[in-house]
Amino acid sequence: MRLLLNSILLIFSMTAAAACLWGVSHLAWYYALPALFGFMLINNMPFAILHEAVHGVAARTAAGNRAIGIIAAWAFPTSFTLQRRAHLNHHKNNRTDKELYDYYLPDQPRWLRNIWMYGGNLLGLYYFCVLLGNLLWFIAPGVYRSRVFVTKIAPALGFGSQVPELAKLPPLTIWSELLGAFLWQALLFWALDLSAAGYLICLWAFALHWSALQYADHAWSRRDVMNGAWNLKVLPVSRWLALNYHCHLAHHQHPQAPWYELPSLVDDQPRPTFWRVYFTMWRYGVRPAPQMGAAADLDFLFPPEK
């Protein structure tokens, strides 16, 4: 039943995303704009299903999880195996010095960390860095796994805690999964007769939303591996299209719970809106890091009335 539900949602979302891609490339601007907005939102659903598969809860069998995870990854596009390793590393490193994008440490230049936050999380470059990394692995896996890339280039781009682990994954598995993902994107481009401009602007719109969401659900939260996240308040339609991804604290506390159980696991901790966190990131940039274990900065997020 779980696999059937997620398969139906995956088919629906990938079909809707394809329709939005077509609309942006072929319709007048007053129809293309809603299609662009639709793609920005609906393309989060395949990613949410990929996220379920990464945790082994998209289906009740390992084979079912792997199959739906590989197909869901086509929409990003990425490799299921790459994403699984990267995301499980995130659960291990969350809010530690290895994975801290809203704060900067004493030995880190603030200007560089602001580039990572503004460029990566708020302007969508985080998504494109992942995409370019996937392309590099596909074209030149030896370069991706090289000492220079792992120890010099990846850390300079903010991926120093991830790439060393990713470079150890089986190359043929990653390459074959990326081949499927890139072929799917090429098929969409050809079959829907997409324009390059329309396709790229859709990717950028999705990048803006996806990149911001990846850290808005953590910024200024408790410096704690398991409890360092928020259950963000969003419109019901946004939460549904992302399959309750905004219930992120509940997910970190219960990573084996499927998406439809997360709302019942939301605790009584303060719940900022997505926009409250998002605009504080824009307004203030990175801030000096508190010690590991420090509580969420509620006075910063919810300033007292004067």
Regions found by a protein language model. Name each.
Residues 1-41, 74-196, 256-306:
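Non-catalytic, topology-defining segments of multipass membrane proteins
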Residues 40-53, 79-83, 195, 199-224, ...:
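Transmembrane alpha-helical segments that form the membrane-embedded catalytic/substrate-channel core
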Residues 50-56, 87, 251:
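His-Asp-centered metal-binding catalytic motifs of divalent-metal-dependent phosphohydrolases/nucleases
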Residues 53-54, 93, 220, 253:
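Active-site His/Glu-centered metal-binding helix of metallohydrolases
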Residues 54, 58-59, 225, 254, ...:
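Active-site-flanking alpha-helical
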Residues 58-78, 99-117, 225-239:
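Juxtamembrane helix-capping/reentrant segments at transmembrane boundaries
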Residues 159-161, 232-247:
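Cytosolic juxtamembrane regulatory segments of multi-pass membrane proteins
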Residues 246-249, 255:
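C-terminal transmembrane module of eukaryotic multi-pass membrane proteins
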